[in-house]
Regions:
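N-terminal Lys/Arg-rich, disordered targeting/topogenic segments
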Residues: 1-29
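Intrinsic-disorder/low-complexity peptide segments enriched for small residues
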Residues: 1-5, 36, 215
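Feature targets compositionally biased, intrinsically disordered low-complexity regions
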Residues: 11, 17, 32, 179-180, ...
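Short juxtamembrane and helix-loop transition motifs at transmembrane-helix boundaries
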Residues: 22, 44, 62-63
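Extended, non-globular alpha-helical segments
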Residues: 23-36, 103
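Hydrophobic membrane-insertion alpha-helices, especially the h-region
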Residues: 32-50
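Catalytic glycan-binding domains that act on GlcNAc-containing polysaccharides
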Residues: 48-218
């Protein structure tokens, strides 16, 4: 092989290596670009799924009169999510008069409303007032605060009493204490009240996570 031929061979090999190197770099860039694109698509999919899940959650977890709830929660020193959860359990934010005569968002019986009016020093109360959301939530929130005070802040007992009445819950608590323990959700004798308490306490957490801004939690 002549010197010139050897030089040409080396140049050819170098050129091939250069072409191969450029092809490898181009392939690497294409792979990187594809990975970045896939990452962007995956991120968009996650964001869309999150928004869809949030929207679906809101469909199954309605909220109206948020301003009224925030106001009453602040005035009565209550968790606004608890008020919302009680409304959800009582009327699902679509109030109708019950067969027992309970009215409004928080399904307050007229006799309970008169009791609350007496406790709070209210005057000029009429039963038709219970159909007004702001009044209904004010009365229901006052009653929740009263029950929480009666049970030293125990939300489970207060919610149980909202459903079953003070006399029943007081009797259950006394019985549990006589046995050396305390009343638990599982030990609530009334199946309806047991399910009600579970529903309210679960919905309370759901409202906190789904509507933190609307309920003034952040």
């Amino acid at each position: 092989m002549s010197r010139q031929t050897a030089i040409e061979v080396r140049r050819g090999r170098a050129a091939k290596r250069g072409h191969a190197s450029r092809r490898a770099r181009a392939a690497s860039r294409r792979t990187l670009g594809a990975l970045v694109a896939l990452g962007v698509v995956a991120l968009i999919a996650i964001l869309i799924a999150s928004e869809v899940n949030h929207a679906v959650s809101k469909l199954g977890l309605p909220l109206t009169n948020a301003e009224v709830i925030r106001k009453q929660a602040a005035e009565k020193h209550l968790d606004p999510a608890l008020i919302a959860a009680v409304i959800y359990a009582e009327s699902k934010f679509a109030p109708q008069r019950s067969s027992a005569g309970a009215e409004g968002l928080m399904q307050i019986l007229p006799e309970t409303a008169y009791f609350i009016a007496h406790l709070s020093g209210g005057s000029r109360f009429t039963e038709s007032d219970l159909a007004t959301p702001s009044i209904n939530v004010a009365y229901g929130s006052y009653y929740l605060r009263y029950l929480l005070g009666h049970y030293d802040g125990n939300e489970m007992l207060a919610v149980a009493a909202y459903n079953a009445g003070l006399a029943n819950v007081d009797r259950w608590v006394a019985r549990a204490r006589a046995d050396g323990g305390h009343l638990t959700v599982a030990a609530i004798p009334f199946p309806e009240t047991r399910a009600y308490v579970e529903r309210v306490l679960s919905a309370q957490q759901d409202y906190r996570s789904t509507y933190p801004r609307q309920l003034g939690l952040r």
